[in-house]
Amino acid sequence: MIAYEKLQQELRRSPRKWLVTGAAGFIGSHLVETLLQLNQKVVGLDNFSTGTPENLEDLQSSLSIKQRRQFRFIEGDITSETDCKRACRGVDYVLHQAALGSVPRSFADPLSTHLANTTGFLQILLAAQKAKVKRVVYASSSSVYGNEKKLPQKEEKTGALLS
């Protein structure tokens, strides 16, 4: 049995409560869907700055009524201490996907990018700490590996950094 199958069995056996930030984004919405299909409780937090309501609507069709009831969505912002505290309440694990992820955008609007990607991340960490969350998983960007063409990219070999 592969590790992913073991993890799926463990999650089904012992459900947990998860917070997915950036829940309306491409990756976030797929994480929400997968967790709900594994009968987990999920809180989604998103401000729709880059994610879309359609991503959340699309996942509904693959879920049972019971699974849909296990999802609570908060339209809020990771830069808001109040929103982060509310989202982290009662959560076991945080999957932090929320970010403004475009290198060109970061040059065009460095303050908004910094606020979301740095201050927002810190707000999530502080709220998670106060809520006694067991673990926060942070999603980085493949841009940190630079423009290396060979896949898979490896940490020890980088091209010209993109961010």
Task: Provide a role label for each language-model segment.
Residues 1-163:
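N-terminal Rossmann-like NAD(P)+-binding domain of SDR-like oxidoreductases, especially those catalyzing
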